């Protein structure tokens, strides 16, 4: 992290802006989501979607994916150079669901990418509005985080499924920029780096020549992003070692896995933003709301307020529970896949249950699924309270070298105790402290051993009533001290990763 003077808030990253004051940030974030809303309305008009169809989250996702695909320059270039059977590189599309004779029918649509780009630019005052595109990517990433536990991906890179709370943003595309980097978890960054190092081990030319130089720059940049997420000097020093390695190999992979494990207790700082589906912004714009004039923030009350009065529908398969589908989407909207379920339940005002107890599959419907039995229901996305999103990781004391929550990466800045089984985690650290990073490893292990489970994170921070938009009256919840609520581990979570 550079000095404080060059630190940008997430909203600045999100909107690509340089340093701005709070009002300017609110206005530029407002401009961004307003553009998404205008684009969505225009697409609904083009596709002749009824009001009900336009509020269907599956239609929203198809439209979002079309615009992301239309602006994916790298892939577009690749498709043009490697023409594959049955793929027109100039077109994009997907399933649109319409209501016909009391049934939902799927219609596959195709559009020229050029046309989609034109509509998007027109909705965004003629600009490319990459910030808005990144915003949609983060919404899709948050939805994936809530839907799938990345067990297989973790095991493939030699990490442990228990580290899944470090995997936020693991499905974000490479092109998601600074705003994307801000929301990536420690595990996601470690995994990207390990994949890169493995390629280097298997392919002698990976680090060589002109391409190799670019690869090296990318490697060092990723190392710096990861370093900036760590909050203790020893973890950062270890990242310097990994970055400066002449020829990254197994030693670096070992170091990275060690660091990822250490992040279960010495949490990294990972940003959280409430990114909503395009149809929600569309509904607000259609009702005459002027986002740019009113201003908008992704980390305050605004997304809660927007969801309080938006009616969004979802298709529901025959044996799915609509309340569970709602929970999945609510978690995605608030980037709360790795939040403590006790905190989420308190804010939402209804019990949030672990993944393995949800009777629902993902939101999207595969093209081979039979539509006959598919119904739709209203998603319940409202909340009882609102809370400020955090990026701190929830370490307790000022030296920042204290306990975060195991298997939880906090989303909301709300006081909670940190119940955790230190023994389980520390067992992973037996043995190997030799090699060039030995002193740092020893220091990191010492800090972890000194972490006290009885500490409280976010001391004095609370939730707020939805009428309290200036956040003047924090309500500090008290939680049952004994059990920490992890979404993926409150049960025997099934493997949903297909």
Curated annotation (Swiss-Prot):
Q: Where is this motif: Unconventional nuclear localization signal?
A: 1-18
- Where is the protein situated, by its record's location annotation? Virion; Host nucleus
Q: How is it modified after translation?
A: Late in virus-infected cells, may be cleaved from a 56-kDa protein to a 53-kDa protein by a cellular caspase. This cleavage might be a marker for the onset of apoptosis in infected cells or have a specific function in virus host interaction.
- Which keywords are on file for this protein? Capsid protein, Helical capsid protein, Host nucleus, Host-virus interaction, Ribonucleoprotein, RNA-binding, Viral nucleoprotein, Viral penetration into host nucleus, Virion, Virus entry into host cell
Annotated region (Disordered), positions in chain: 1-21
The cross-references to Pfam families, in alphabetical order and at most eight, read: Flu_NP (PF00506)
Q: What GO cellular component is one of the record's annotations?
A: host cell
Q: Which domain of life is it from?
A: Viruses
State its role: Encapsidates the negative strand viral RNA, protecting it from nucleases. The encapsidated genomic RNA is termed the ribonucleoprotein (RNP) and serves as template for transcription and replication. The RNP needs to be localized in the host nucleus to start an infectious cycle, but is too large to diffuse through the nuclear pore complex. NP comprises at least 2 nuclear localization signals that are responsible for the active RNP import into the nucleus through cellular importin alpha/beta pathway.
The main location class comes to virion
One of its GO biological process terms is: viral penetration into host nucleus
Query: Of which family is this protein a member?
Result: Belongs to the influenza viruses nucleoprotein family.
User: Assembly and partners?
Assistant: Homomultimerizes to form the nucleocapsid. May bind host exportin-1/XPO1. Binds to viral genomic RNA. Protein-RNA contacts are mediated by a combination of electrostatic interactions between positively charged residues and the phosphate backbone and planar interactions between aromatic side chains and bases.
Bipartite nuclear localization signal, short sequence motif: residues = 198-216
Record the organism.
Answer: Influenza A virus (strain A/Chicken/Pennsylvania/1/1983 H5N2)
- Gene this chain is encoded by: NP
Entry protein name = Nucleoprotein
**Does the record's keyword annotation contain RNA-binding?**
yes
Which GO MF term does the entry hold, naming one? Answer: structural molecule activity
């Amino acid at each position: 992290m550079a000095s404080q003077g060059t630190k940008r808030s997430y909203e600045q990253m999100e909107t690509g802006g340089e340093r701005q004051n709070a009002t300017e940030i609110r206005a530029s974030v407002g401009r961004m989501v307003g553009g998404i809303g205008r684009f969505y309305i225009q697409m609904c008009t083009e596709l002749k979607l009824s009001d009900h169809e336009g509020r269907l989250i599956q239609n929203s996702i198809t439209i979002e994916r079309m615009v992301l695909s239309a602006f994916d320059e790298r892939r577009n270039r690749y498709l043009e150079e490697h023409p594959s059977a049955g793929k027109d590189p100039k077109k994009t599309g997907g399933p649109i669901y319409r209501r016909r004779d009391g049934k939902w029918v799927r219609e596959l649509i195709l559009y020229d990418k050029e046309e989609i780009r034109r509509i998007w630019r027109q909705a965004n005052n003629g600009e490319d509005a990459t910030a808005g595109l990144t915003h949609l990517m983060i919404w899709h990433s948050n939805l994936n985080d809530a839907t799938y536990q990345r067990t297989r991906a973790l095991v493939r890179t030699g990490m442990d499924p228990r580290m899944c709370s470090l995997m936020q943003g693991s499905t974000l595309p490479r092109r998601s920029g600074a705003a994307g980097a801000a929301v990536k978890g420690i595990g996601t960054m470690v995994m990207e780096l390990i994949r890169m190092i493995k390629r280097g081990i298997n392919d002698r030319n990976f680090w060589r020549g002109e391409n190799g130089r670019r690869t090296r720059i990318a490697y060092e940049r990723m190392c710096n992003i990861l370093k900036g997420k760590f909050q203790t000097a020893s973890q950062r020093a270890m990242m310097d070692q990994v970055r400066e390695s002449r020829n990254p190999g197994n030693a670096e992979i070992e170091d990275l896995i060690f660091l990822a494990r250490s992040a279960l207790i010495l949490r990294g700082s990972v940003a959280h933003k409430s990114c909503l589906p395009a149809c929600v912004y569309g509904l607000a714009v259609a009702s005459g709301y002027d986002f740019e004039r009113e201003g908008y923030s992704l980390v305050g009350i605004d997304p809660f307020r927007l969801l309080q009065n938006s009616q969004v529908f979802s298709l529901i398969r025959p044996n799915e529970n609509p309340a569970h589908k709602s929970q999945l989407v609510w978690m995605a909207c608030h980037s709360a896949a790795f939040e403590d379920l006790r905190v989420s339940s308190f804010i939402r005002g209804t019990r949030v249950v672990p993944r393995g107890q949800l009777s629902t599959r993902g939101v999207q419907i595969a093209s081979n699924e039979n539509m006959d039995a598919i119904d739709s229901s209203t998603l319940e996305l409202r909340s009882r309270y609102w809370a400020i999103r955090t990026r701190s990781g929830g370490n307790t004391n000022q030296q920042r070298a204290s306990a975060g929550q195991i298997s939880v990466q906090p989303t909301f800045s709300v006081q909670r105790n940190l119940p955790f089984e230190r023994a389980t985690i520390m067992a992973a650290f037996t043995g190997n402290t030799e090699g060039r990073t030995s002193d740092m490893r020893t220091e990191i292990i010492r800090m972890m051993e000194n972490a006290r489970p009885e500490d409280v994170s976010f001391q004095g921070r609370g939730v707020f009533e939805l009428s309290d938009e200036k956040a003047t009256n924090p309500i500090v919840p008290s939680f049952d001290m004994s059990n920490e609520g992890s979404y993926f581990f409150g049960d025997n979570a099934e493997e949903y990763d297909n």
